[in-house]
């Protein structure tokens, strides 16, 4: 297992009218709520220690400090939760997509 930080970026399509972007507070709340079940729950699929969500102009950066077997698996688990939350609110997130950012390994036992 490793303690690592993963970054995931959520983006609106490039041709989206900026006037139709959801409010930053809505983006932050929606994405934070998607990850909340993993936070502070050691028995979850991916224990998330802390999570920061930074919305910016039709996009958001999600940074999660977590404990997991690999950066790839951590990114996949978090991305699946974000994707489900965005699909649950299609009026706000129609056409949005996710991109993996950097993975930082802080400590590993292997």
Pin down the residues of each PLM region.
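Long, contiguous binding/interaction regions
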Residues: 1-60, 68-80, 84-110
């Amino acid at each position: 297992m490793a303690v690592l930080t993963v970054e995931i970026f959520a983006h609106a399509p490039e041709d989206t009218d900026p006037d139709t972007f959801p409010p930053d507070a809505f983006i932050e709340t929606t994405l934070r709520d998607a990850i909340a079940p993993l936070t502070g729950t050691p028995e979850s699929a991916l224990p998330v220690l802390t999570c920061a969500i930074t919305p910016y102009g039709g996009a958001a950066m999600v940074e999660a400090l977590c404990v997991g077997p690999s950066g790839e698996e951590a990114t996949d688990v978090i991305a699946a939760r974000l994707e489900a939350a965005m699909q649950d609110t299609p009026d706000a997130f129609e056409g949005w997509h996710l991109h993996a950012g950097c993975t930082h390994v802080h400590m590993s036992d292997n």
